[in-house]
Every structure is written in structure tokens, then in C-alpha cells.
């Protein structure tokens, strides 16, 4: 039942951005809550690559992704992993933690890639769709135009933000300055 202003969210985004290095890969274990949205927006706006996974994925599956993609940072619910102590804690929020891993930063990150969205979470076979800043921006603006979304509208999150449809609702309504009711129940 809390309300957050765009100013508050913007300040939190800038704070998180100040804590991460450029050319990083960030694994985001997301849930439909304000901290997940702020973390996601921080990483997208800083032009780092985010690997977005849903909190409902089994930890063993997420560990496979970590071994495969070797993220420089992990943003996850506090206590989601039992090994967080072996990484350097950067930020600890109300329910979320940002840790720096021991993996080396990639030297040749494709600046066009911005987001990796899982396509096969239910099969436990890690496959991702790569989205660029242009993909996200074009898609967001297209949805806003087609659905006539503006700052007067209110939406509710009913799909997980780690799914393309759920994320498009968040992206389009944030971009339009709309109100979003963040709901973790589908």
C-alpha cells in the first residue's frame, strides 16, 4: 500500500547506477515489486547488459545461468541464494541485495545488447532472446501509441516482469508516466 513518486524512483536509480561499473553483465532475479523495477531500470539506463530471470525459477537453474554467463553483478532477493556471502555486497535494500561477483568484466560487450530475456524457464533449458536499446525503445513507444497510454492511466502488474508481456506493461507505462500498481499475485 505504499506510493512512490517518479522523483523517488529516479533518485534510487541514480544511486544504484553509481555503484556499478560500465560494460558489466548483471543477473537480475526479479519479482513484481518496486525494488525489482528500480534495479531493472538502473541497469537498463546504465547501458549494461541485464539477464532477467523470474524469482520463481529454481536456484539450481539460476546457478546454471550464472556459470554460463558469468555475471559481474547479481541483483536478487535477500536470502534467495545461500552463497551470497562469498561475493562482495554492494547494496542491501529492504528485500533485495546487489553483489559484485568474482567474474572478470567482459572486454568486448556488444553495446547494442541491453537485455537477455529467458524463453525456456519452464523447460530448465537456458535460452535467451537478446534485446537492444533500440528494440526496447521502439517496442515501448509502439505499445504506448497503439494503446493510447498516457500519464493519466493506471495499470496493474499481473504477469511476472521477467516475462516479455509483463515487462512490456512496466516499460510502456513507466515511459508514459502512468501509475503502476505493483502486484505479485497473478
Write out the residue ranges for each language-model feature.
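Conserved AMP-binding A3 loop
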Residues: 5-6, 113-141
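Conserved AMP-binding/adenylate-forming
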Residues: 15-56, 158-160
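Proline-aspartate-enriched helix->loop->beta-strand connector
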Residues: 70-74
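Conserved AMP-binding/adenylation subdomain of ANL enzymes
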Residues: 137-154, 162-186
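Conserved AMP-binding/adenylate-forming core of the ANL superfamily
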Residues: 1-20, 60-63, 131-134
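Flexible, low-complexity linker/hinge segments
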Residues: 88-114
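ATP-dependent adenylate-forming carboxylate-activation enzymes
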Residues: 12, 30, 51-66, 178-186
